[in-house]
Amino acid sequence: MRVLVTGATGFIGSHVIRELLKRNHQVIATSLDKEGLERFDWYDKVEYVPYNIGPATEENLYTLFKEPELLIHLSWAGIPHFKDLIHLKNVGDNFAFINNLLQNGLKDVTVVGTCLEYGMQEGCLKEDMETRPTTPYGLGKDCLRRFLEQTKKE
């Protein structure tokens, strides 16, 4: 399977890529930090496509990223500054990015959320719990999830 991984140089992204390669998937990695990407032992086993997730573009991102079958979306600007208002801007940018891929042929998407979508709670969290974000980061991730769920229904 051809898998596009955003946020490839992040902690989660680097481990996801390693596991995908172990399972013999073709990986397309994107990140703004090519030098950071080159430090991983798997760098020469992936296709690197530099891209900055920003405002909506008319460019066909599905073609740019060589027609992936699955997107694993891990990229998110502004971490670890959880109270920064950039997280509210991220909602539109990330939705436009994912929607462009879907509109142009992508069939399968996995987006990583955050425990902060549930607010400041103690104990185990479950997916069926009500979300109550209290930070711009949690709110941004929760809004993106809701927009994507609505898009799926349409």
Mark where each language-model region is.
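N-terminal Rossmann NAD(P)H-binding glycine-rich loop of SDR-like oxidoreductase domains
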Residues: 3-23
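Conserved glycine-rich Rossmann-like NAD(P)H-binding loop of the short-chain dehydrogenase/reductase
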Residues: 25-34
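Conserved catalytic-core motifs of eukaryotic protein kinase domains, centered on the activation segment
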Residues: 40, 80-86, 120-125
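NAD(P)H-binding glycine-rich loop region in Rossmannoid oxidoreductase-like domains
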Residues: 51-90
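Catalytic Tyr-X3-Lys loop
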Residues: 81-95, 99, 133, 139
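Active-site Tyr-X1-5-Lys
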Residues: 134-154
